[in-house]
């Protein structure tokens, strides 16, 4: 058996940005870690871009049946691996498998959560976590309803770590991104992200195609959309939006864009933190972290198409500076090191 210090599990692409600085701290301090991830979207590609060494185990499911089957298969695969390296502590953000495997192998779990509405995930994970790190705006009482305890809050959002992983030079912003995408920078660039096809955002009409059609009639601009699946790609190509054919550097594109409209969460918050005018058209109740950024005048929320169009026309290109908020990296590092003494 190999004895390692830390196990980190990544389950979505933004987690690569989020944990980047923590991993660099581990490497600097000689802390031995194991990185695992699953086959999901462009996650594996980002792990490669960041030059991280990790092991891909399992994949993402779209249907409820697939989610359950792939969850079980991934738990088995991770158990086989982790039982042979026996780390002193495990850390993840919203991974449903890490808490179950770590709990079963008697490994302490530090869990990062910023979505108080992800009922299924939270029920499966929070009761098994020894410590829960969360943004101050994430509703602690709601998390307690799912069995969470031992909360540690920070004054910011998780996307602060995402942005800092790029702005602090670990993987520098690519200021040639527009040119690489063949986008004319004579016109402003608007980035859009549709609603996720997930367990917490189903059955809501996508208003972005209609917004695109209206904007194209009123503004000379580049509209770049990051669809979440092949069906969405077809929809946005039909309205003549720019749909990247391959995995591209979304954070660099945001940094070099003039506006963001999103029906999701992560890209909206990254955009707001970068100081880009941002509209959330998320169709359900907002997360606490979104309300937090709205209160700081970094984002607005509306599903009214006319209001969105008017806001774009009034604010296109009116960037603010990067907002100063707490980066959770130091807190995560401190809590991990507490188990390595």
UniProtKB/Swiss-Prot annotation:
UniProt-listed Gene3D superfamilies: Glycogen Phosphorylase B
InterPro entries: DUF354
Pfam family, one: DUF354
Domain of life of the native organism: Archaea
Protein name, as recorded: Uncharacterized protein MJ0665
Biological source species: Methanocaldococcus jannaschii (strain ATCC 43067 / DSM 2661 / JAL-1 / JCM 10045 / NBRC 100440)
Lineage: Archaea, Methanobacteriati, Methanobacteriota, Methanomada group, Methanococci
């Amino acid at each position: 058996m190999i004895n390692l210090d830390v196990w980190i599990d990544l389950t979505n692409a933004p987690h690569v940005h989020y944990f980047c600085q923590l991993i660099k701290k581990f490497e600097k301090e000689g802390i031995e870690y194991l990185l695992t991830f699953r086959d999901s979207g462009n996650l594996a590609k980002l792990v490669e871009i960041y030059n991280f060494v990790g092991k891909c185990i399992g994949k993402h499911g779209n249907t409820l049946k697939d989610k359950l089957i792939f969850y079980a298969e991934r738990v088995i695969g991770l158990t086989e691996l982790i039982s042979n390296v026996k780390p002193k502590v495990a850390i993840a953000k919203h991974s449903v498998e890490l808490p179950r495997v770590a709990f079963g192998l008697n490994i302490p779990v530090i869990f990062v959560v910023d979505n108080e509405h992800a009922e299924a995930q939270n029920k499966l994970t929070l009761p098994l976590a020894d410590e829960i790190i969360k943004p101050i705006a994430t509703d602690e009482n709601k998390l307690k309803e799912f069995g969470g305890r031992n909360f540690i809050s920070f004054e910011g959002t998780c996307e602060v770590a995402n942005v800092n992983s790029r702005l602090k030079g670990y993987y520098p912003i690519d200021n040639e991104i527009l040119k690489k995408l063949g986008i004319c920078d004579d016109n402003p660039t608007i980035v859009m992200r549709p609603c996720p096809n997930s367990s917490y955002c189903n059955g809501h009409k996508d208003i972005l195609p209609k917004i695109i059609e209206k904007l194209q009639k009123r503004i000379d601009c580049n509209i770049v959309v990051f669809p979440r699946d092949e069906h969405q790609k077809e929809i946005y190509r039909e309205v003549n939006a720019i749909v990247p054919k391959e995995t591209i550097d979304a954070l660099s594109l945001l940094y070099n864009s003039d506006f963001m409209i999103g029906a999701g969460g992560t890209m909206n918050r990254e955009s707001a933190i970068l100081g880009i005018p941002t509209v959330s058209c998320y169709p359900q109740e907002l997360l606490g972290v979104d309300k937090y950024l709205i209160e700081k005048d970094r984002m607005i929320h509306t599903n009214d198409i006319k209001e969105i169009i008017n806001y774009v026309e009034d604010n296109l290109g009116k960037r603010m500076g990067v907002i100063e908020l707490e980066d959770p990296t130091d807190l995560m590092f401190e809590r991990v090191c507490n188990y390595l003494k």
